[in-house]
Design a protein with these regions (language model features):
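Short, acidic loop-to-helix structural element flanking the phosphoryl-transfer center
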Residues: 39-67, 73-77
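Acidic, Mg2+-coordinating phosphoryl-transfer loop and its flanking beta/alpha structural elements
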Residues: 127-168
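Conserved Lys-Pro-Asp/Glu-containing loop-to-beta segment of HAD-superfamily phosphomonoesterases
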Residues: 104-135
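Surface-exposed amphipathic alpha-helices with a cationic face
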Residues: 52-59, 112, 135-140
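A metal-dependent, Asp-based hydrolase signature
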Residues: 7-39, 49-57
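Conserved H-loop
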Residues: 86-90, 118, 164
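A short, structured active-site edge motif that brings together acidic residues
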Residues: 86-101, 124
């Protein structure tokens, strides 16, 4: 539970903020973290029950699905492959290992570019996220924001960050899509 605040924002930013590290120390902490994460930590996670069905149904409805993550894209793709989620995604965008594109707004901008979403089509886009950085990044891109509380958000965090909608379970998310 002490590490929940590290989930969502760029890790370098979190290391510097919570441990008062300077730039060099922050990069060293990030390097050490990635040494363990690339082989072990990367798969210390799982898929919420119901997500496979939800994604499958959304694809059957003809919806485009993108993953926009602050996690390095190379790791995001490995995780999606491991849990057999990659076929559901039209676009996967993450940060670069060299530190480029770590801001969530930039990640979402790139996902929208790859999806070929024109400015006039952004009202058709919904960003789903479980941390305030997701809501802020979506706001920078002028897309609707749905916050999920079955992730890592603290109570009230998503609304304070501008979520247009919130749900507490995968079932509620499924119901949201049935209604929209």
């Amino acid at each position: 539970e002490d590490l929940v605040d590290f989930i969502g924002p760029p890790l370098l930013e979190s290391f510097q903020k919570y441990y008062q590290l300077d730039d060099a120390q922050g990069h060293m902490a990030l390097k050490k973290y990635r040494e363990r994460f690339k082989d072990i930590g990367i798969f210390e996670n799982g898929v919420y029950p119901g997500i496979h069905t939800l994604l499958s149904d959304l694809k059957k409805q003809g919806r485009s699905i993108a993953l926009a993550t602050s996690k390095p894209e190379v790791y995001a793709r490995r995780i999606l492959d491991k849990y057999e989620l990659m076929p559901y995604f039209d676009v996967v965008v993450g940060s670069e290992m060299d530190g480029r594109r770590t801001d969530k707004g930039e990640v979402i901008t790139e996902a929208l570019r790859q999806l070929q979403v024109a400015d006039g089509q952004r009202q058709e886009v919904l960003m789903i996220g479980d941390r305030l950085h997701d809501m802020i990044g979506a706001g920078k891109n002028h897309v609707d924001k749905l916050g999920v509380y079955y992730g890592y958000a603290h109570e009230g965090e998503l609304e304070e960050a501008g979520a247009d909608y919130t749900v507490c379970t995968v079932e509620e998310l499924y119901d949201f899509f049935k209604a929209h």
